Amino acid sequence: MRNARSAGHTGGMSENGSGVVLAVSLDGSHRFSKVPVEEIRLREGWGVDGDAHAGVTVQHRSRVARDPTQPNLRQVHLVHAELFDEVDAAGYAVAPGELGENVTTRGIDLLGLPTGTVLHLGESAAVEVTGLRNPCAQINGFEQGLLGELVGRDADGDVVRKAGVMAVVLAGGAVRPGDGIRVELPSGERLPLRPV
């Protein structure tokens, strides 16, 4: 398995440096899509206040069914808006929050970041990237055929997952559309993202 960056899909985005928050979304229920809002509040070690996926232990239903004591590595879901541009060209109209993400970004190659990258959002919030979102069949329930655009294979036959990244909250704070994002790459060995 290779991530999108190793498959050559940087799309002109920055893999270190900076980007911007395009939208923020949350939902207190376990629905596929989230509702765009003016602001979300991140809480250290917890996630997005008021979001169904916030918590110290796993909150995603499939993971709770397997082992409810697992640490929650999916407190915050981030998707790059460049993905919306890509699927729009294939005939799928997707708006911020509709893929279930809490933070929609622009200008950062999220999929090309190594595990452990810290994203500084706005004035004080920070999240650590834990891995790739593993797209599931619910995506086709949202829009038939979209899953095929979010999971594919590269020229070497390796699986490419494009549905964003998951993170845990290191430092709390408010995050709003228009906030800057600063990328802090991990020191030492840089491990590629894997599904979490």
Predicted regions and their residues:
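Metal-cofactor-dependent catalytic cores
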Residues: R2-V196
